[in-house]
Every structure is written in structure tokens, then in C-alpha cells.
Amino acid sequence: MTQDKQARNASHDAAADALGALLDEGKTVVFLTLGAPTVYSTYWYVHKRVAARGYAAELVPGVPSFCAAAAAMGRALCEDGEMLHIIPATHGRAEEGPALPGRTALMKTGKSVLEVRHLLRQRGEPGSAALLPTVGYDGQRLHKHTTE
């Protein structure tokens, strides 16, 4: 994914154009996505465009990756009134999560995983986080601590 907003918008427009063309042919179209289509999903941007053009577009809920990751680890995301913060680690925002009270799920950590590890070490909490870079995929890997 590019950080260039113009390029992203152009890509979303092109996807909506392609879907619209298929719908105009009377075809039924499915846009399958991993996780939930309403949580940091490319699909949401395409959905808005397709719906704005007057097409019927249905959202089918999925399992967000942070929920799938917690289940794979056998952990609760939060308990006893703890706050849960879902933070995208993109765009240099990784440091926001660990500073908040409660629990944090950092999403999209691929390019910032070393930054997250450094932040946790600075806070004296290097073993307090787990990483599932391939949650939901065949052969998903679980790193119980970010020190791995």
C-alpha cells in the first residue's frame, strides 16, 4: 500500500470502475477481503464509491485480524473494563498505542515492527506484546514476545 493519497484514491476509483462495469453487465460481484471490511480495509473505500454510484452494495461482517490473533494466542483482548485501542501502526503512529491506558492492538505493523520493538524496549516492556504477522493464513506464525 502506498502512502501517496492521490495514488490510493486513483486505485480505489479504478476498482470501483471495474466493479461497476461488471454490475452493469448484470453480474453478481463479490469483493472478498481478509478480516473485517469495516476495519482498515481497502474494501471500505471501494464500497463507498460503488454505493455512491447507486449500486446495491452489501457489507458482510468478517472477523477482524486483531480478534483472530487474540483467539490464536488464547488471550482476551481486554478484561474487567479495560480499554482497548485499535491503532494502525502506519504513518509513524506506532508510538501512540503503548502510551494509552489499557490494551492496544497495533495493526499493519509490517514496515514498523522494528519501531514497535524499540518503543516497547524503551518502556521496559519488551516481552509484553505478541506478533502474528500471518494471522488467518495457512502456516500462520505466532511470536509470543516481540523480542523473538
PLM feature segments, named:
Residues M1-A56:
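Class I S-adenosyl-L-methionine
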Residues M1-Q6, G92-A94, Y137-G139:
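A short acidic, often aromatic-flanked loop/helix-cap motif at beta-alpha or helix-coil junctions
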Residues R8, D24-V29, P98-E148:
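A contiguous loop/helix-start segment that scaffolds small-molecule binding in enzyme catalytic cores
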Residues D13-A16, H91-G92, V113:
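Structural motif corresponding to alpha-helix initiation and N-cap regions
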Residues G20, W44-H47, C67-A70, L114-R121:
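Predominant activation on well-ordered alpha-helical scaffold segments within soluble catalytic domains
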Residues E25, T38-L100:
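Class I SAM-dependent methyltransferase SAM-binding "motif I" and its flanking Rossmann-like core
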Residues T33, P88, P133:
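Pocket-edge structural micro-motifs
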